[in-house]
UniProtKB/Swiss-Prot annotation:
Alphabetized Pfam families for the sequence: DUF520 (PF04461)
Keywords associated with the record: Nucleotide-binding
Keyword Nucleotide-binding attached: yes
Cellular component terms (Gene Ontology): cytosol
Its job: Nucleotide-binding protein.
Name of the featured protein: Nucleotide-binding protein GWCH70_0711
SUPFAM superfamilies: YajQ-like
Single GO molecular function: nucleotide binding
Family in the record: Belongs to the YajQ family.
Annotated HAMAP family: YajQ
CDD domains the record matches: YajQ_like
Entry keyword annotation includes Nucleotide-binding: yes
Amino acid sequence: MSKESSFDIVSKVDLSEVTNAINIALKEIKNRYDFKGSKSDISLDKDELVLISDDEFKLEQLKDVLIGKLIRRGVPTKNIQYGKIEPAAGGTVRQRAKLVQGIDKENAKKINTIIKNTGLKVKSQVQDDQIRVSGKSKDDLQKVIAAIREADLPIDVQFVNYR
């Protein structure tokens, strides 16, 4: 009598770590010489980042500082989708960036295709914004995890509830 093992594939961003990274980035910007007198700011509204700066060059520098801090805090930067740069009030420019939470249908199909192409005896089911993979052999499940990690997906995925 063999019991089935399973794990879930999710794509989540820890918002508390994002908030910490924003605070550290703002502290660095306040102390940097090239940002003296600048109206640069980063804010977080639910699952959207808003970057504001004097011009596009400073906005790119602001984005580089933020990405560095996010990486240091362990936040996946693949899950950030940047919008276009738009003019804002007071001669500044703004850019919105959406934090992607969960796996959408398109990426779920890609992941399911990767799982099917392994040829292993595992089943995968899409459950809302996550995918559950189950099979009798834990070795097969680990091979599926390795195959998904090797694939170049547009989002960062985590593996949880390994049973």
